[in-house]
Structure formats: structure tokens, C-alpha cells
Amino acid sequence: MEDHVLKKLNANGPAPHIPNLNLYGKKMNFSYMVMTLLGRNLQDLESTNFVVNKGFSRGTWSRVGIQWVYALKYVHYNGFIHRNVNTQNLFLGNEKDSERAKIIHILDFGLGRPFARYHARENKWIVRIARHSAEFRGSFRYASPNVHLRKEQGRVDDVWSLPYVIIELNGGKALPWQTDYRRGRVEQMKLNLTPKDVMSDMPACMDKLMPHLASLNYYQRPDDHMIFKCFWQVMENEKITPSSKFDWENEEPDMSVPPAAWENPDGRYFQSNPLEINGPPTPAEVDFVL
């Protein structure tokens, strides 16, 4: 699945926040892939000595969040869901790669799944019908409540991992279930704790994030633009710009690096909806996705 998804995501050339797939194949009993050389993942950066008291400042995690939403949006708009987003699967570009060094890349599509298919004859994307139940896929620390309930995962469930990770990165704070490795106990906390309980140490502008996600079903599209604006508000409150140093950086920002698409303060990219999917397939469309 990994090479299949990366091939699709790179079909139109180098993609933002996605490593290039340069070579892949199978020889004897071994499968191989050659892709863009990246840097450290967020888990490594969080625990490194570069970061004081662990965790990240609000100015850093707000920009990480925006780039993460951008990466997920690109994956979703190519008809896939990731199903295992966590700090181990989000990588910075290699520090010697000036174009990618400050960019968050999403990786590890081994649990990925197409949730929609493009039909050339109809010239439209058609969503797959949700299964009545689905196996648990992902990390139980960051998985959405829907995953614990064995519901079909959609775009919203990828985004559910976002607040959980950001809470963990927020100055080294802990999730309520941070040190609990009992799946049943983690499940009960996720299902019973209110968003206010979970987000108690977060900026007020983030309060709407979890209630919004809780209101969506498998077919509905998360409001990427609203989520973007939440993170952008945190940036503004912290007097941070996209060019500011991340917590792990020592050198001054390189102002010659071209701005990324997400740096537009209006968030125009996040307002687009090329799949035009926000509900279940019509009876006429069902035959195309079965």
C-alpha cells in the first residue's frame, strides 16, 4: 500500500509535504522503495536537547499544525485516508535540503485506504460506502473515538489525531491517557471526557476544534479552513510569522526561502473542495463504488 499511495500522490510531479517516490520494486523476497531523504520526526524533535523542558512553544506547534492540515488535505484530495497519523509519521525535511528543511512531511501509508474513487466517465469523485464495522487501525493513543467504536474511518478521523498530538506537544503537557497503556481504559476516557477536559491547557481559540470534529460523520468533510484559522490565531497571538525560527533551530531564518502555499493568511488553499464530497453516494453512484 505504501508505494501505491506515494505513486498516486506523486502522479503529477513533486507534491507538497509528501516525499518523492524515486524508485520502488521487488527483488526475490524483498520489497524496496527509494524516496526523498528526510530529517527527524516530531517524536525525536520533542525529546531532543534542542527543546527546553520538552514539548514545543505555541509559536512552533501552531505552524506544525497548519502544515499537518495542509498535508492531510492533500492526501484526502487524492482520495486516500492515512489512518495512522502520529508524531512518528511526521518528518521535517533534511536540514541540508533548503526547499524542504522547514516543511513537515507525512509518511507511512501502510494502513492507508482509499475512501473515494475518481470516475472518468462521470468526471467526478464518488465516495465509498462506509462499512457497518471496521477493524481497529492506528495508534490507540491518537486514534479517534470512532476508531475505538470500530466505525469506518473517514477524513475526520485523520484530523482527530491532530488535537491529541498538539496537546502533547504543548509545552510538554500530557494527554489524560498519556501513561495508560490499557486500550479499554484509554477508550473509556476518550468516550467520556468532554472536549473541555481534554483541551484545558490549550488557547481559547482552539476550543471549537474538537466539538466540530465530534459533529461529523464518515462522509462529511472537516472544515479545513476553520481549523487553519484556529492555528493562525495562535500564531498571531504569539507574534509569530511563518518565517520565524522553530524551537529546534539555532540559526536565524533564511528569508530567501520561497513561502509555502499555507503561508497565505487568508487560507485560500484550505477553502477549496475539489472532491466535492460531503455526504453519502446517491443511489445512482453506488454501482460505481461497489
Curated annotation (Swiss-Prot):
InterPro entries: CK1_Ser-Thr_kinase, Kinase-like_dom_sf, Prot_kinase_dom. It holds the Pfam family Pkinase. One of its GO terms (molecular function) is ATP binding. Residues 1-240 form the Protein kinase domain. Residues 244-263, 268-290 are annotated as: Disordered. Gene3D superfamilies: Transferase(Phosphotransferase) domain 1. It comes from the Eukaryota. GO terms for biological process: signal transduction. One of its GO terms (cellular component) is nucleus. PROSITE patterns: PROTEIN_KINASE_DOM. Belongs to the protein kinase superfamily. CK1 Ser/Thr protein kinase family. The protein kinase domain is predicted to be catalytically inactive. This is Inactive tau-tubulin kinase ttbk-6. It comes from Caenorhabditis elegans. The gene is ttbk-6.
